[in-house]
């Protein structure tokens, strides 16, 4: 197996685009990082387990005003992320609070290490949907990629989620050349056998991924070519309003699908309607930059109307066009994936 530690990228001379008025409608979707802590240290997210990172988290009672401000600003779809959101000691209460606000969609992305004990409580609290991140079905590879994770715990968590009544769980896999790209068919068929939706992600050129993308990138076109015997020759299609993945149907059963997320080869900036909230309460209009608006003080003070105004201010800063193409290694690596949830 090839090394999975990041290697250096040649610097590109272009600077990040200047932020300007965004032409899209107001944000309808938000990803909220409730914590920047994680029990894994995946190679495309963190440089090491002991990287000197100082963890920060918005106080629990500040999240209520934050959620209300987002709702007033027009957000209809919420996804909770991390770090690892299930590490937050009050994650079930957070889900219950959001569910009571009647958002159209309430989802959570997890590494599933804590899901065996939390799947049923999360379902009872009102969580609609789950995405599970899993990059390999080989236990040793899993330990290598996550720097110590236990695959058995993750698989038990997935089983618990299915038993709790979660359906159409999405299985997210970051495909890395020489690391797990020989498992594409195994991962896809494993997900289908469990009525899950496999989604294959190109490594994104940000954070540690900025260093990995040059040597470990497998494009969606290559992934699809390798899976051609399993898939219909359809045009890949997005689910409107439900994220950037483009789906292709299975030959054996057209109700089964594979999603491809092309964060590098064919970016999706133009159709993005997503705002991100960091674990410290910063409103981030774009994953690829550190630009944003700090809403922590307004949330801590219990002023949802002020949070609402700050949401609109942050959205006005959303870049137009293809930000990825302008990323240098230095600027892209400065983005902390763990604090904004990817």
Feature-to-residue mapping (PLM):
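Conserved alpha-helical substructure of the radical SAM core
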Residues: 2-82, 86-105
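Auxiliary Fe-S-binding modules of radical SAM enzymes
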Residues: 2-30, 189-193, 200-342
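A short, compositionally biased micro-patch
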Residues: 35-37, 101, 125, 251-253, ...
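Short, small-residue-rich loop/turn micro-motifs
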Residues: 36-38, 46, 134-136, 202, ...
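Glycine-centered loop/turn positions within well-structured domains
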Residues: 40, 139-140, 267, 293
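Residues that scaffold the ATP/ADP-binding catalytic core of kinase and kinase-like folds
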Residues: 41, 45, 140, 145, ...
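A short acidic, helix-capping loop that chelates divalent metal ions and anchors anionic groups
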Residues: 49-54, 138-145, 207-211, 294-295
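Radical SAM/AdoMet-radical enzyme domain recognition
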Residues: 60-80, 84-201
């Amino acid at each position: 197996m090839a090394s999975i530690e990041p290697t250096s990228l040649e610097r590109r001379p272009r600077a990040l685009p200047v932020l300007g008025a965004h032409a899209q409608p107001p944000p309808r979707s938000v990803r909220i990082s409730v914590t920047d802590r994680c029990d894994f240290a995946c190679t495309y997210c963190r440089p090491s387990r002991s990287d000197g990172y100082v963890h920060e988290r918005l106080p629990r009672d500040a999240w209520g005003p934050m959620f209300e401000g987002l709702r007033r600003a027009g957000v209809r779809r919420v996804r909770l992320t991390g770090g690892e959101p299930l590490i937050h000691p009050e994650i079930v209460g957070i889900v219950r609070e959001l569910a009571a606000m009647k958002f159209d969609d309430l989802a959570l992305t997890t590494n599933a290490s804590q899901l065996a004990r939390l799947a049923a409580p999360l379902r009872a609290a009102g969580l609609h949907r789950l995405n599970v991140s899993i990059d390999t079905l080989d236990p040793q590879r899993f330990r290598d990629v996550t720097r110590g994770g236990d695959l058995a715990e993750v698989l038990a968590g997935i089983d618990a989620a299915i038993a709790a009544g979660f359906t159409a769980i999405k299985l997210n896999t970051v495909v890395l050349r020489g690391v797990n790209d020989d498992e594409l068919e195994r991962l896809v068929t494993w997900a289908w056998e469990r009525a899950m939706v496999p989604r294959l992600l190109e490594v994104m050129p940000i954070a540690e991924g900025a260093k990995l993308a040059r040597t470990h990138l497998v494009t969606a076109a290559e992934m699809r070519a390798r899976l051609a015997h399993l898939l219909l020759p359809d045009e890949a299609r997005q689910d409107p309003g439900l994220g950037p993945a483009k789906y292709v149907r299975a030959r054996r059963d057209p109700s089964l699908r594979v999603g491809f997320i092309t964060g590098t080869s064919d970016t999706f900036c133009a159709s993005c309607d997503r705002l991100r909230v960091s674990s410290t309460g910063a409103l981030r209009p774009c994953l690829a930059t550190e630009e944003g608006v700090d809403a922590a003080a307004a949330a801590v003070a219990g002023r949802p109307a002020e949070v609402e105004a700050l949401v609109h201010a942050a959205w006005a800063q959303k870049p137009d066009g293809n930000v990825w193409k302008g990323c240098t290694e230095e600027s892209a690596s400065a983005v902390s994936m763990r604090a904004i949830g990817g």
